[in-house]
């Protein structure tokens, strides 16, 4: 059975329609023309560097220089770049796109701070030490689309050896994380960094997680404080502690499948959730009942029984440019 939800909030019009999941055969054709969806499609939309200059880089120095300004630009990454360094700061109006699956940043991550209109697609980021920050950090920023990325570390070290894979903090807003492979990590993705930051975060931190493959994760898949989350069409494999809603967060969880999880959907510190058509694989939903039943954009649901076949092998760096 195919589940389809079309949810339009009152007072909003002209929202771009998008199909979050592409078939394998259509990925290459659609890669260059795909548009941001979910929360990143709101607030004027997220177009990155469309219409700006185009550059291809293959070294750390060239990459750092290419992404820094706020001018419209598309930066293609060709091949791997390895450097043990602090996060590279990304300017507004930027698209960072890996040309293929070899475009991997190792040892350093990306920081989108006090910026807007940023797209990160088809890029790998791995093994960023905690002292160097998150693999992808989004702070004080709005309209960011992270799509078809492969982010990971390992679990051979203790939980504090690496920091987060994709963290959205300090009142960041209108963010979508989609079609991504998030794996082999202790604490994967955090929305809202502190129980004491409610004054700044409340009314912000609107994040969509769609069509993602989470694998071999200990916790934070994701963990949300204060904000609003929509998590759908995702496959969770060997994720011990999955979706954690806390500190008043409201989360809508739909059409997901969990295999090998201890806690699929749960609440600490009074977080809330509404769940529909999820296969928790024997784990339980212990979150407090929430009120988030609709979101202000259109989307399509796969149905929990179809998520694995649609997401595994498609999520991650599967595009070519």
UniProtKB/Swiss-Prot annotation:
Glycans are attached at residues 93, 238. Residues 1-18 form the signal peptide. Gene3D superfamilies: Single-stranded right-handed beta-helix, Pectin lyase-like. One of its GO terms (cellular component) is extracellular region. Ca(2+) binds at residues 134, 163, 167. Pfam families: Pectate_lyase_4 (PF00544). Its cofactor is Ca(2+). Keywords: Calcium, Carbohydrate metabolism, Cell wall biogenesis/degradation, Glycoprotein, Lyase, Metal-binding, Polysaccharide degradation, Secreted, Signal. One of its GO terms (biological process) is pectin catabolic process. The keyword Lyase applies. It catalyses: Eliminative cleavage of (1->4)-alpha-D-galacturonan to give oligosaccharides with 4-deoxy-alpha-D-galact-4-enuronosyl groups at their non-reducing ends. The active site is at residue 220. GO terms for molecular function: fibrinogen binding; metal ion binding; pectate lyase activity. Its EC number is 4.2.2.2. Binds 1 Ca(2+) ion per subunit. The keyword Cell wall biogenesis/degradation applies. Belongs to the polysaccharide lyase 1 family. Pectinolytic enzyme consist of four classes of enzymes: pectin lyase, polygalacturonase, pectin methylesterase and rhamnogalacturonase. Among pectinolytic enzymes, pectin lyase is the most important in depolymerization of pectin, since it cleaves internal glycosidic bonds of highly methylated pectins. Favors pectate, the anion, over pectin, the methyl ester. This is Probable pectate lyase A. It comes from Aspergillus fumigatus (strain ATCC MYA-4609 / CBS 101355 / FGSC A1100 / Af293) (Neosartorya fumigata).
């Amino acid at each position: 059975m195919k589940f389809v939800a079309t949810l339009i909030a009152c007072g909003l019009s002209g929202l771009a329609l998008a199909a979050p999941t592409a078939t394998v055969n259509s990925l290459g054709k659609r890669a260059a023309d795909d548009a941001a969806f979910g929360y990143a499609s709101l607030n004027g939309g997220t177009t990155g560097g469309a219409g700006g200059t185009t550059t291809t880089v293959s070294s750390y120095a060239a990459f750092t220089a290419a992404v820094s300004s706020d001018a419209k630009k598309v930066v293609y990454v060709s091949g791997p770049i390895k450097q043990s360094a602090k996060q590279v700061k990304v300017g507004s109006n930027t698209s960072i796109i890996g040309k293929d699956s070899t475009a991997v940043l190792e040892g350093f991550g990306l920081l989108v701070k006090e910026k807007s209109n940023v797209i990160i697609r088809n890029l790998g980021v791995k093994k960023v030490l905690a002292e160097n920050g998150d693999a992808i950090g989004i702070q004080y920023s709005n309209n960011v689309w992270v799509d078809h990325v492969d982010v990971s570390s390992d679990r051979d070290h203790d939980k504090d050896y690496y920091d987060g894979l994709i963290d959205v903090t300090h009142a960041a807003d209108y963010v979508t994380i989609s079609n991504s492979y998030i794996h082999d990590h202790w604490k994967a993705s955090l929305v809202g960094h502190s129980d004491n930051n409610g004054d700044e975060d409340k009314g912000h931190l609107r994040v969509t997680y769609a069509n993602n493959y989470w694998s071999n994760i200990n916790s934070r898949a994701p963990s949300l404080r204060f904000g609003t989350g929509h998590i759908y069409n995702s496959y969770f494999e060997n994720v011990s502690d999955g979706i954690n809603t806390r500190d008043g967060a409201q989360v809508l969880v739909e059409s997901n499948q969990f295999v090998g999880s201890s806690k699929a959907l749960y609440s600490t510190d009074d977080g809330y959730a509404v769940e529909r058509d999820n296969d928790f694989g024997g784990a339980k939903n212990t979150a407090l009942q929430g009120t988030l039943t609709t979101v202000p954009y259109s989307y399509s649901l796969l149905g929990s029984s179809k998520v694995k076949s649609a997401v595994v092998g498609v999520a991650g760096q599967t595009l070519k440019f």
